[in-house]
Amino acid sequence: MISCAEQRSRQGEAGRGPAPVAPAFLPLWLPRGCSGILSVPAVAMHSAGTPRAESPMSRQEKDAELDRRIVALRKKNQALLRRYQEIQEDRRQAEQGGMAVTTPALLQPDGLTVTISQVPGEKRVVSRNWARGTCGPRVTNEMLEDEDAEDHGGTFCLGELVELAVTMENKAEGKRIVSEKPTRARNQGIEGSPGGRVTRSPPTQVAISSDSARKGSWEPWSRPVGEPPEAGWDYAQWKQEREQIDLARLARHRDAQGDWRRPWDLDKAKSTLQDCSQLRGEGPARAGSRRGPRSHQKLQPPPLLPDGKGRGGQASRPSVAPATGSKARGKERLTGRARRWDMKEDKEELEGQEGSQSTRETPSEEEQAQKQSGMEQGRLGSAPAASPALASPEGPKGESVASTASSVPCSPQEPDLAPLDLSLGGAGIPGPRESGCVLGLRPGAQESPVSWPEGSKQQPLGWSNHQAELEVQTCPEPQRGAGLPEPGEDRSGKSGAQQGLAPRSRPTRGGSQRSRGTAGVRRRTGRPGPAGRC
């Protein structure tokens, strides 16, 4: 059950809330224990109203807050005023010192860039001040005179009052470049409009140097390549001015002794501008000479010595041929291995021609050898004494070997055939009487219808590649029997061998070399040389 005290406390809490407009008595539903209606006067509900003493205190606090804000704003304004005064004082001092750049205010040029090449350890002070006004030649000259008197940089005019003066602490050299996009004539000045407004001249490109040696000097106006010539523009004067600028630039890169300042310029040749112009003129001609047809640049093989070797004693190799253009025709299109093979065939043809010339010389040499053998035969007939038999490598078989060698030269059925060591100065051989032996040169496989393959066992032992094979011809007397071949048969066999050689135009490399070697021996000695032994 809820006691009456609790009911009263609840009524008191309800009375502290907002005072609604209600009757004097409020009906309350009570639980089962309490019955009846409690009457609460409305005045008790309004007992806790807002205090009136707090309103004057809040007004005083608000006034104090406003006062603090006013003081803060005054301090800020004073600080801004002092800062503004300091700036104005600094600007006034800069203008008095001649370090100011004054240009029209509210009319800043389009695309004006100021580039200063700063040297480490130096300070530059550059200040700009834009101001309305025009700049005439007289004003510009006065500015230049003032700047020279004060030992400062150059001043220039772009149709308006534009001053550029950069001061350094140590008054050293320095280059200042002020460039704009050139669009119209550079000499066009400022014209006043009918309304009295001031119009700007078109932007131009200016390069000014403040070197101590050239103070107040104006570098010429530069015009980009491709621009149409302007009115009143003299090319000769412009060219001369550009050359002077180039010479001055080269002079800046050299010291007092004339040497280059930078280490990477030491390898430059001391060329003048005339040399540069000559090189420019020769450039297109030199390029045109390089574009000539490559077909005229044919590779010539190196000259060969008679022994088939190049310089240095080694077998000459054809150098690698450079690749030619695709417009070449015929053999000139060959590159690499194909060109080397073509040169190899040309070399073999040349050797074949030399071998054929040597074979043409052999018949006349054989005739001379036969004459000499006839003379020796007369001497041997008058001699009373018989000389010992000639020594052959195979004993008594040498005579049969000689006869078979003359009848069937280089037959593959006789692997043991060996040449005879014969000399024309020796005496005759007892037994089958023979007056002498004639040594006929055979250039290997070139004259023989049946040749031995190189490297086979049928090649005679003890023979080197550069030695020629010898053909032994016997010259019998009329009393000799029919067992030995007649000289006519030998000549017919040799002529048949030469006829068999005629259709072949390209001999093997080894045979041609042997033929050349033996031909050289016959030319030097005048008679057949003895067969070599290993």
Curated annotation (Swiss-Prot):
InterPro entries: DUF4594 (IPR029336). Residues 201-211, 401-410, 456-467 have a biased composition (Polar residues). Residues 382-393 have a biased composition (Low complexity). Residues 288-297 have a biased composition (Basic residues). Keywords: Coiled coil, Phosphoprotein. Residues 60-97 form a coiled coil. Residues 173-183, 329-347 have a biased composition (Basic and acidic residues). Residues 173-237, 274-534 are annotated as: Disordered. Pfam families: DUF4594 (PF15266). The modification Phosphoserine is found at S201, S392. GO terms for molecular function: RNA binding. This is Coiled-coil domain-containing protein 9B. It comes from Homo sapiens. The gene is CCDC9B.
